[in-house]
């Protein structure tokens, strides 16, 4: 399975960004249970929209799934709003 993605520091407004295995599908889960998916670029970077409802102390999680269907363990980031 791929390594867990890295989530850059998260705030209440800016897009949520990070790095993962290039070409892997990153699934970001917001505190309210909704998700966003994006494919990491050739340099491994990825970005999803900020939902706009994050508050200080919320936790955002992300997993990476490689083209073979193997999913990483979760990475977490605590919102610093």
Language model segments and positions:
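Ser/Thr-rich low-complexity repeats and stalk/linker segments
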Residues: 1-81
């Amino acid at each position: 399975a791929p390594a867990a993605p890295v989530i850059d520091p998260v705030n209440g407004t800016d897009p949520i960004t990070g790095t993962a295995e290039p070409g892997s599908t990153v699934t970001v889960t917001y505190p309210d249970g909704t998700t966003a998916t994006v494919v990491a670029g050739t340099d491994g970077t990825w970005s999803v929209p900020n939902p706009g409802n994050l508050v200080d102390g919320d936790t955002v999680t992300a997993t990476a799934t490689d083209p073979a269907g193997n999913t990483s363990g979760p990475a977490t980031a605590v919102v610093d709003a």
